Amino acid sequence: MLNVVILAAGLGKRMQSDLPKVLHSLAGKPMLEHVLDSASQLEPGRIVVVVGHGADRVRGAYEGRAGLSFALQQPQQGTGHAVQQAVPLLQEDGKDDVTLVLYGDVPLVQPDTLRRLLQARGQGAAVLTELLDDATGYGRIVRNEQGQVQRIVEHKDASEAERAIREVNTGILAAPTGRLKDWLSRIDNNNAQGEYYLTDVVGLAVADGVPVGAAQPSAGWETLGVNSRVQQAELERRWQQEQARRQLEAGVTLADPARFDVRGTLTCGRDVFIDVGCVFEGKVELADGVRVGPHCVLRDVSVGAGTHIDAYSHVQQATVGRDARIGPYARLRPGASLGDRTHVGNFVEIKNSVLDADSKANHLAYIGDADIGARVNVGAGTITCNYDGANKHRTIIEDDAFIGSDTQLVAPVRVGRGATLGAGTTLTRDAPAGQLTVSRARQTTIEGWQRPQKKS
């Protein structure tokens, strides 16, 4: 049975914020959520989050998440004391029970690294370590002449010889659950900080004859913690650099990898091109040959092969077919579904609407709550008037219709197949198929009329 304990009780004073530190965002989601997602991939029997400062807000953010429990650390008296608060919630079934300790402000540790750590422990304990050129402030890994881990000494408690050690403790640890409970009951706060150190369980394990293994992360950024806005920004950049590297290695062309942000997951086909300043949020899928112009924002979208999305377009919770042309300055809102070879041009907004294959809305239009068939032309300035002040109503435009410029369609209303609406029409009743419908006032010329002149 695998238990995961995530320490998330810290104040985060240097963040200069009322928001609990672990709820601050990294790559589009709270730091704690990154840790929860990585832990969940290990399929633990239970995850316990130890909360303290801002406990109610942290609980409120994740209370409904399956398999999650909370323990309160009050007051905060060190990492060992924090894990002690989780002890009553740890589960054991007698089958290789193990507890993994993670940190809510170390958000980017990867599941593969955690799997290696669990393997490294064998039947004993294991710590995740790292080699640093400058180890100032970190706990040092002290090994014996045979290279076996003996203990961890915190920087403030270390001798000069121990401070010369480059291998440091990341704080992440795995240990047999039953033995961990025993070791936690035996640690004390006889140290420079006056706190109960989780690291002391390593020395207790060695004293009890329990082997302590070690593993290293695949990349140094995995174990970087966040204690300030500066560190948050630095880690954000490191993570975005990693995202860019992965996309480049997968064959995506990035106009500038330094100006590229993924705040979720981005899946790309072959020969995708992404220009500068683009942001991808949630789950985004780009098929083969998609081109995304500069400064676009895509959130929870699927884009078909060969589609071009031009500059400054925003696409959210929408689907776009093959070989479509979107933008520049287009906005697709939730529920927009565009078919193959559709065109949505500058300053066109589409919400909760279907635009079937080969239909076009190239200029200055609002299409909301509409079902538009194939090969429809929507003229500039067209508006579907979908809201009556209380309820939304749908507009239906059948195949091959032509909607003239500056037209208002007052829903609920239907435009029949092949119908034409004259420019300036305000449509309040259904337009019959194959006919021209016009509702604007008749043009009049007043002969002899003179424009008023200013009085001198």
Curated annotation (Swiss-Prot):
Residues 1-229 are annotated as: Pyrophosphorylase. Disulfide bonds: none annotated. Its cofactor is Mg(2+). Keywords: Acyltransferase, Cell shape, Cell wall biogenesis/degradation, Cytoplasm, Magnesium, Metal-binding, Multifunctional enzyme, Nucleotidyltransferase, Peptidoglycan synthesis, Repeat, Transferase. It is found in: Cytoplasm. Residues 251-456 are annotated as: N-acetyltransferase. Residues 230-250 are annotated as: Linker. UDP-N-acetyl-alpha-D-glucosamine binds at residues 7-10, 21, 73, 78-79, 103-105, 139, 154, 169, 227, 333, 351, 366, 377. Pathway: Nucleotide-sugar biosynthesis; UDP-N-acetyl-alpha-D-glucosamine biosynthesis; N-acetyl-alpha-D-glucosamine 1-phosphate from alpha-D-glucosamine 6-phosphate (route II): step 2/2; Nucleotide-sugar biosynthesis; UDP-N-acetyl-alpha-D-glucosamine biosynthesis; UDP-N-acetyl-alpha-D-glucosamine from N-acetyl-alpha-D-glucosamine 1-phosphate: step 1/1; Bacterial outer membrane biogenesis; LPS lipid A biosynthesis. Homotrimer. This is Bifunctional protein GlmU. It comes from Bordetella petrii (strain ATCC BAA-461 / DSM 12804 / CCUG 43448).
